[in-house]
Amino acid sequence: MSPNSLPAATHEELGDELSAVRMSDMMALVRGGGRLAATRGERLRTLIMLGRPRTCVPGLLAFALGFSYTAGAPLARTALGATLALSIGFSANLHNVATDLYEDSRNLPGRVTLLAKIGARPLIVLCRSLSALMMAGAVALGAYFALFMGLAVVGLHQYSSPPVRSKGRPILGLWVFAQAVVFPFLFGWTTAPGRMLETLLAAMTAPLRGAAPPPAAEAWTSWRYLAMWFFLTLWFMAKGTFKNVPDYDGDLAAGIRTSATLCKSRRSAARLAAALTVASYASLVPLVAFGLERPRVLVALAWLVPVTANGLRLVRAEDGPTSNAVLRADMVISSGFIATLLLLVAPRLESVAMVVLGAAILFGSDLLELDSRRDADARGPFAPDSGVQLRPPPRGM
């Protein structure tokens, strides 16, 4: 049966029988402004799945880590900062879904179905509304917070969108991806900025100005914060190389230059990602060697055992769906590592509370399947070259 002779149906007539639908027609439905029939409750659940709260946990813990270098702030101010730290990752995930339709049709076909329940245009409107709310919350926390939030909203949304579309620029793409934890780390500081920045600048410029440097204890906190910022950047850039491997086939087909598609094969990309990931964790050692962190933080490197094992699993993975399962495990490992690091850097009750909250989000999302990189999404419900054609949606839908 040729594609043009396939039976036609509306999405209402199909119900849940999406296995009969061609991927090309589902993509056309989304691009044409249509969407699948769904209740409000289903759309809300789908929205949360597309926002992928489990992937926002490292950002939340990075916020807590950044906040631990400050003198503290009132609970309401801290709670708002933490909420905004979670929101920036959630918003970026939603935006990427709206812009990565072609890649997702190859890498995560099930995600196209989820997008079709929301609709591409409504999702973009929602992303813009969420960005406006985040900026309003950032303004309430002061000029520093608002400045970095503005950069985060623009920068992270340019990961998949023109004119920059940094995901197609290998090094820049990894650096922008790393900002998913770096900006929350900066939000932690800017929730209660104190004089950390002024102290750091004074310490750096004192020899040039011929002036006395700030007190050593004050300067040490600022230098520690800067060193941890550098470590988190390297760590999450390496995680970006890991994340790119499961998307190898779709990104290659779309002509997107990533750290993975620059390699000759998926396995070569996996080897590179595994090596860089192990090296990034080990880069915590120089922070202790130069006296910028206490020796106890090296206990967090016990996570190198599961990190290495998971890297080997990535190298052995034969296809995208199998690699996606490895990537999901990597998120648990990454969250566990930064939670351990937080508790070692700042062994306080507030840190424990943030770790408990992060664990609840991570494991709650898994329990309730509130994610759009599940095995079902990687394998998808579609038959790419055969099936039922979708008739265009009625006007006004």
Which residues does each predicted region cover?
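Multi-pass alpha-helical membrane architecture of UbiA-family
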Residues: S2-M397
